[in-house]
From Swiss-Prot:
Gene Ontology CC entries for this record: virion component
Protein name listed in UniProt: Core protein VP3
Membrane-traversing stretches: none
Alphabetical keyword list: Virion
Amino acid sequence: MAAQNEQRPERIKTTPYLEGDVLSSDSGPLLSVFALQEIMQKVRQVQADYMTATREVDFTVPDVQKILDDIKTLAAEQVYKIVKVPSISFRHIVMQSRDRVLRVDTYYEEMSQVGDVITEDEPEKFYSTIIKKVRFIRGKGSFILHDIPTRDHRGMEVAEPEVLGVEFKNVLPVLTAEHRAMIQNALDGSIIENGNVATRDVDVFIGACSEPIYRIYNRLQGYIEAVQLQELRNSIGWLERLGQRKRITYSQEVLTDFRRQDTIWVLALQLPVNPQVVWDVPRSSIANLIMNIATCLPTGEYIAPNPRISSITLTQRITTTGPFAILTGSTPTAQQLNDVRKIYLALMFPGQIVLDLKIDPGERMDPAVRMVAGVVGHLLFTAGGRFTNLTQNMARQLDIALNDYLLYMYNTRVQVNYGPTGEPLDFQIGRNQYDCNVFRADFATGTGYNGWATIDVEYRDPAPYVHAQRYIRYCGIDSRELINPTTYGIGMTYHCYNEMLRMLVAAGRDSEAAYFRSMLPFHMVRFARINQIINEDLHSVFSLPDDMFNALLPDLIAGAHQNADPVVLDVSWISLWFAFNRSFEPTHRNEMLEIAPLIESVYASELSVMKVDMRHLSLMQRRFPDVLIQARPSHFWKAVLNDSPEAVKAVMNLSHSHNFINIRDMMRWVLLPSLQPSLKLVLEEEAWAAANDFEDLMLTDQVYMHRDMLPEPRLDDIERFRQEGFYYTNMLEAPPEIDRVVQYTYEIARLQANMGQFRAALRRIMDDDDWVRFGGVLRTVRVKFFDARPPDDILQGLPFSYDTNEKGGLSYATIKYATETTIFYLIYNVEFSNTPDSLVLINPTYTMTKVFINKRIVERVRVGQILAVLNRRFVAYKGKMRIMDITQSLKMGTKLAAPTV
């Protein structure tokens, strides 16, 4: 027994007023999963009908907590890397010559291997390949140089050869001593200069780098050198404002020494978040609602009032026949407690979540349940004025239930004078003839419910989030007041509650009126807590914008459907009684509360990157129509989604809305101007600027068909042949003469194929030594090097595919232009033992494909030009400098305990 007593946890109760039955404890993420399940039940009713005629969709409820953890992981990721040496931009291929080598731009060589082969009939693959190539540029150039290796030469600091970005060590063994000395002298001249960037000492040197990569590096360096000091001040100032609103102190522990002279700091994200970025996402209102619940809603318990309240008012007699007395001792089931959760979710998200009544024949047959719900429903909910917690149907059903309760003469008979309309509550009751018409719902004025004659939406001091400036004031309670449950609510009241007491007294319901008088402090504490939760904890970028909030009620009444339609949840009649007898008492602030701004910034930044990608991809069809003949906007939407972080996709698709997004939604989102500034967005935009030249992506439309004989030189002087460094390539140095080029469009090719003359026409052009260009289609280009005869499929490959077949007595031809094109370099190697005709064949070998790209991918250079590409200015931070990413400081610090908990 002693062991059992030790294991039993002690229940700590804060004040005597809070004594009661604790039903359950709900945290923000748990409630978000519950809300998501309930919301999905409603959403699926529409979606399932639609999907019966289309494809299947996975309707499993996602794990919100895992999604939040993944987004936090995204915030910790760096879009740049810190390295000691830059990547090799140029390498050299040794030939048999002692004074000539082939210099290869490794960027183009690596870029040619990125992505899939482009075809005309797979636009989604084309879009995906473009994104992969753009991300390759961004990733390749996003580096910061730190602690580069150097050496001392005659009192000067000189860069080590591997820092220069040129790989030439394989060339040195074949060079003469004179050439090696010349290169060594050039290396000794790579002096490190001392520079000053943003009051920080840095090393400056000249190195080699490919143009697209250097653009990204230069943009990143410019971002760092701009210091971002004002952005940091704005972010910290905004966090302090938000902390004041949410009762959280901002912690500056990360920022204690970032201003020291030995520290370089990078701010990758910014605050505040542009809310327009989050709310512009198509069909995102439900996802944003769930994120608001998961990141902001506190953990709480459902507290029952002091049981003596009902015992001395409703059940004081031995025999009790009234509806309230009958329900006093009832115990809720699990399903009814779920309905209580729905009711409190609807109260915390007014207008966004509205309630309707379940069709439950059992409860409809129980008049006591309906009548009690009709009374407490008018005291729990707001129906009109500025917002509503109810549908019009539920408000009318509550009016009918209240009407039945007032006319149920179970104690003493009371005089009733009926009105002429026959509407619910159209009568006067009691000796003083109280007019009950005022309790009939009127959504225009809020009459009959909590919004009656109260200011329940207020605009006062500017809120941190510019899109949500409203303050909710249920029952006219100001959320700035401090709540002491033992005394709060005593002597407080509001119009609807007063009128309900007057009407109950007029109807002869003295016991019930006494019960509600005793419940008034508990009732006011309930709504004071809800007001504080809404106006403090739930204030977030995921909060519904004011313009949408103000339009919810008029649209609901008019039956108009807008971007943010309310979610309707069904509750039972008896759950209204249980909700009235329980109050949501927050016990712990949400654990995500202090990191929520960082999560919001990461999410908005990723959305902005996606939008920039989609904007550029949407232009592709106009720039290159031949390769995107069958393209639709949905293709680049899917391509961007597939290459986006899983966590961001999961947030966007919390309610499985992606299956129902149409082209109008997508194009509207793409054209909206809102973006969230961040380092990742800056680098992505620069990568797209570099990718505007498609030749930098190793894509080209300058592919020609021309019959050319593979060179077979005589080896009369082998030494001279080796010194020249002889090689052959199908890469053109200039496009062919335009009067010798025949432009073959798809229409011409189809016409000749239908006439059965396609091959013959091409053969005639080849015999005339002319050139054929097949349309303006973009092709994937690969770069390959050979020191022996290349395979025949490369040598004799054609820049198109032409297939014919016969079926049913008819001939069919298939023509495709978008094929993979290979730029090959054949390096001739000979030995002194070779005879003059060693390279000569009886029958010549022909090559059929020629490519022109206006880039210096490979060039033959003399040994003295090996280091001629050192023309880029690099900035490197000294080894004793610290590089800090202070993005993680953009989160609030310690949550303050509520003064009354």
